[in-house]
């Protein structure tokens, strides 16, 4: 039996930071005196690991005791990077999170730095998977509440904004001009006016054109928008009559207005009349107490470092479990960053049918890569590597920590709205803007974005930036909303998860995140094919 086949059969739940297989506390180690322990030194994540992770820079010559191992560090180990706990021979598996993250390219001495210079991926082509279901011990917990906007169709938004949605990139400049003019309508219960520009809607074929139309329709129905102006040109492929007939379906004609620019003499004058009507309609909504079971939260990471899978991502995973225990919904995406850890998700699928859909989710993305003559493991990024992530397996095993321990209840195609409460998997790439947009399009009212490097981007919905380390949180305070780096200093995962849950309730009740305060709003549609 190959390692890939053996990995597909193994039944292992995602690790919990600070716990081993027996659910006993696994210490984060410090070599300082009692008064110097506000910054810990290293962590061995799983009892089977032959590497540990530095939680602060470790100097050459430092002597460390890691469980049964006595290690003298041979060279400087940057924060978030790995060092060997025992000699690792060339060709031997390097184990982290209890799983193989690659093979040693050369002999590595105990205490040696383990990174891209001496570690290579073990990922290859498509695999065959066997369903070995793992039961979840997640239980219901007490109700929680936030103040949201109940829409006429029963759905709940966490913002009451007016959205201008172009059907085609040709009218982007008009949409942006209208956004500026319509800011005068902001006030009272109208929280903002936002134009979501994009370059698509014409000169597209096949799946690309279909995806654009689905995304536009989903955005029109998103509950964070109290009013929507759909702005068309008139000659585009994704024109307003086609969208109405085949994609949008039923809509509230007080909430959604349409304008085709080629049909009127002065499109800005006519658009402002419609926007004023939308402002009156949206202004009639007010926040009301809503059960947290109505929340749909997207989960994404980017600019990850070696601490992302130890602090920020497990915190989000624990948050996900907490929200789901209260009847809420979370969505996990960025499929290419599941490669190498996919069986942890597959075996948590509630039914064989969901398992089969998850297999297709993974293999369809692998086929997408190979159809473009690209390798499936062309990841991590330069920033990931600088932060301590060495291979895609290393990245994926950390990335999937965001899923927590809940069973998989749904598997969504790109631009497919979420229908089932609980944990859902969504088909979308790893690209930050494209994936975050995909989460919003599928119904997320808020996106949680973990990062070890930092990024200012936004998405169509409030995007909470969660740092994996305290240095980033201090250095880029204008970007970071929540610091999970304190897990290696003075807080537990459960404590941070509860704090994050409380913060999300505050955001859902109107608190602006840093990107919103800066006025940032982005939308990026997934492009796969040719442009005419």
Report the location of each language-model feature.
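Short, compositionally biased terminal leader/tail segments enriched in small/polar residues
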Residues: 4-5, 29
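Short secondary-structure boundary segments
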Residues: 451
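Metallocofactor- and cofactor-centric catalytic cores in central/energy metabolism, strongly enriched
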Residues: 39-416, 420-446, 456, 462-532
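Short, Lys/Arg-enriched N-terminal segments with co-localized hydrophobic residues
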Residues: 15, 19-38
